[in-house]
């Protein structure tokens, strides 16, 4: 799933986009996942109405980016030189477990493509090219090209992520990744190719955080799709039973639920219908 790329950080900036990471390199290395993450990902993805409610905020952005009229889940960046530009999502999260997908074509990332979360106070524009998300104490970001985590980056060095990377290695990423924000535990994590990469940031409890990215590539287009969320309260017993049955069947056999000797109402419940 993950592929290590050796070389200096400078070479990482200009490298050709890597092929889809080879999963064999991370076998046995997956860190412990948040307790309820599998439950969230087993749920049907949010519908379009919910996705639009959690989409990029056209009123909370750098002036050099705009949300597309024909695709409200996607923003486009104008080709402005010596500028780093960001945008926040509409909905901030202070509680619960949330996941959203970021689709950012590798060839449109350039030297500073950063994905993460931010408070409402974090800046969304900077002169020059920089890892804007994570540059101050109001945002937390993963630089996709350098494979570095930044928070208060003006005063602290970046940290390699995923954790198995060496100091001069980067991580070949596909076009899409999942962001996992657990405000009950106060953590931010990422999933690539179905592989949980471990906790990137801790200590986020007590804040209200919004999805955010910052970009430098002219004409880049980045799409955000909210996957789903779980409230902090314990799940009802029926939901836990459904999760247990679906886990026992496995993803490949979920299509067989319709043939089980069960009442139709229960079959429907198992299929989230």
Swiss-Prot record:
Record-linked CDD domains: SPRY_SOCS1-2-4
Molecular function, one GO term: ubiquitin-like ligase-substrate adaptor activity
UniProt KW Ribonucleoprotein keyword: no
GO biological process, one term: protein ubiquitination
PROSITE patterns found in the cross-reference section: B302_SPRY, SOCS
Gene Ontology CC terms, in alphabetical order: cytosol
Membrane spanning residue stretches: none
Start and end residues of each B30.2/SPRY domain: 34-233
SOCS box domain boundaries: 234-273
Key words of the record: Biological rhythms, Cytoplasm, Ubl conjugation pathway
Compartment(s) of residence: Cytoplasm; Cytoplasm, Cytosol
Pathway the protein acts in: Protein modification; protein ubiquitination
Protein family membership: Belongs to the SPSB family.
Domain comment quoted from the record: The SOCS box domain mediates the interaction with the Elongin BC complex, an adapter module in different E3 ubiquitin ligase complexes. Essential for its ability to link NOS2 and the ECS E3 ubiquitin ligase complex components ELOC and CUL5.
Binding partners and assembly: Component of the probable ECS(SPSB4) E3 ubiquitin-protein ligase complex which contains CUL5, RNF7/RBX2, Elongin BC complex and SPSB4. Interacts with CUL5; RNF7; ELOB and ELOC. Interacts with MET. Interacts (via B30.2/SPRY domain) with PAWR; this interaction occurs in association with the Elongin BC complex. Interacts with NOS2. Interacts with EPHB2.
Role description: Substrate recognition component of a SCF-like ECS (Elongin BC-CUL2/5-SOCS-box protein) E3 ubiquitin-protein ligase complex which mediates the ubiquitination and subsequent proteasomal degradation of target proteins. Negatively regulates nitric oxide (NO) production and limits cellular toxicity in activated macrophages by mediating the ubiquitination and proteasomal degradation of NOS2. Acts as a bridge which links NOS2 with the ECS E3 ubiquitin ligase complex components ELOC and CUL5.
Name of the protein in question: SPRY domain-containing SOCS box protein 4
């Amino acid at each position: 799933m993950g592929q290590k790329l050796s070389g200096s950080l400078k070479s990482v900036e200009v490298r050709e986009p890597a092929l889809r990471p080879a999963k064999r390199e991370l076998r046995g290395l997956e860190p412990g996942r948040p307790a309820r993450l599998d439950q969230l990902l087993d749920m049907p993805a949010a519908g379009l109405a919910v996705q639009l409610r959690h989409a990029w905020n056209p009123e909370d952005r750098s002036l050099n980016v705009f949300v597309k009229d024909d695709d409200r889940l996607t923003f486009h960046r104008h080709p402005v030189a010596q500028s780093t530009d960001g945008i926040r999502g509409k909905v901030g999260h202070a509680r619960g477990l949330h996941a959203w997908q970021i689709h950012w074509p590798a060839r449109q990332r350039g030297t500073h493509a950063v994905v993460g979360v931010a408070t409402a106070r974090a800046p969304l524009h900077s002169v020059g090219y920089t890892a804007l998300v994570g540059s101050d104490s109001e945002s937390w970001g993963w630089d996709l090209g350098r494979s570095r985590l930044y928070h208060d980056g003006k005063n602290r060095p970046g940290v390699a992520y995923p954790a198995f990377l060496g100091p001069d290695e980067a991580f070949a990423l596909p076009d899409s990744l999942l962001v996992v924000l657990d405000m009950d535990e106060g953590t931010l994590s990422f999933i690539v190719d179905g592989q949980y990469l471990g906790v990137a940031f801790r200590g986020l409890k007590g804040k209200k955080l919004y999805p955010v990215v910052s970009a430098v590539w002219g004409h880049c287009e980045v799409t955000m799709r909210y996957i789903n969320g779980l409230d902090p309260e314990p799940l009802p017993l029926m939901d836990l039973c459904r999760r247990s049955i679906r886990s026992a069947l496995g993803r490949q056999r979920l299509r067989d639920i319709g043939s089980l000797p069960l009442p139709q109402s229960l079959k429907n419940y198992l299929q989230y219908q």
